[in-house]
């Protein structure tokens, strides 16, 4: 028996999902802590709207004692048609966060496994994500490969 249990989150988990998303950003960009905190309300509104419209599927991992160990979400996004696939919607894995005391104990793997299973059950042909430096080895273990996305930051 595993020491963890996976559940699919609901709107009732909104506070947790917001907190975990902000903690994820603070882990990745500690120097931006103040501006990350300033984004709390817009993050809350965004997560709430995506759950209510059905495009955000949260996965929450708890210990057998009901303590929160981590969370992550699938966001179903729309893309342009592309050769080799007739799908214009695809799952995007985001907001992966594991509570520090449960890191390296398989929590993130439980979430990734659930996201892959959910995506297959819903007949998607791919999953995309952006990996942090720390998360890269985990995703490679599951067969994710790096793509050629580039980004240009525009000044306002």
Describe the role of every protein-language-model region.
Residues 5-19:
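A short beta-loop-alpha structural element at the N-terminal edge
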Residues 25-46:
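Conserved GNAT-fold acetyl-CoA-binding loop/helix
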Residues 45-60:
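A short helix-loop-beta-strand connector motif used in the catalytic cores of GNAT acetyltransferases and
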Residues 60, 67-76, 92, 97:
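Conserved beta-strand in the GNAT
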Residues 76-82, 128-134, 140, 145-156:
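Conserved catalytic-core motifs of GNAT/GCN5-like acyltransferases
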Residues 84-100, 152:
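Conserved acetyl-CoA binding element of GNAT-fold acetyltransferases
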Residues 102, 106-114:
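Conserved acetyl-CoA pyrophosphate-binding loop and the N-cap/start of the following alpha-helix
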Residues 112, 119-131:
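Conserved GNAT acetyl-CoA-binding A-motif
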């Amino acid at each position: 028996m595993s020491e963890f249990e996976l559940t699919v989150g609901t709107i009732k988990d909104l506070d947790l999902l917001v907190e975990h998303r902000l903690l994820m950003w603070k882990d990745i960009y500690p120097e931006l802590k103040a501006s990350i905190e300033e984004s709390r309300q817009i993050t809350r509104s965004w997560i709430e709207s995506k759950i209510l419209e059905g495009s955000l599927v949260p996965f929450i991992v708890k210990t057998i004692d009901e303590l929160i160990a981590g969370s992550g979400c699938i966001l179903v996004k729309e893309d342009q048609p592309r050769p080799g696939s007739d799908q214009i919607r695809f799952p995007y894995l985001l907001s992966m966060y594991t509570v520090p005391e449960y890191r390296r104990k398989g929590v993130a793997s439980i979430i990734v496994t659930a996201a892959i299973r959910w995506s297959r059950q819903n007949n998607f042909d791919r999953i995309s994500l952006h990996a942090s430096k720390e998360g890269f080895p985990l995703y490679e273990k599951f067969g994710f490969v790096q793509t050629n996305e580039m980004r240009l930051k525009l000044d306002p």
